[in-house]
């Protein structure tokens, strides 16, 4: 299974490689890990205490999370999901296997919506930014085309019938 691109019959045909990556499992689960790191950093910064009164989240744990943020163990997560039937908890477990010192703080105080909903917002924002950038390029190229051919006469059409003269540049706008 490819994890670096989103696959469907439509995406295979019509989506750019950039868009396929934005909606890929890799992007999704790496974003989950970034969110868990951000959560741990915030809990550390705010001085969250454990039951003994010490820091609940240490910088050593955060560094361990960062060291494994990119290397997702899909096989462990897949096997764990068969057991717990929960995608978020299976990835918490898989991440914890890679980060034994930080295992207890991954997803600490969060709900599944924390990673799920925030990741959806991040992915949609990035996808819309990509569409915006590509659309700006199309508009720019169309404007260049219209200016290049602003004086080239051609016949206009209305209801598929020949009409008055116009220019190719005007027809492009």
Task: Give the location of each predicted region.
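A helix-coil-helix interface module used to build multimeric assemblies
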Residues: 1-173
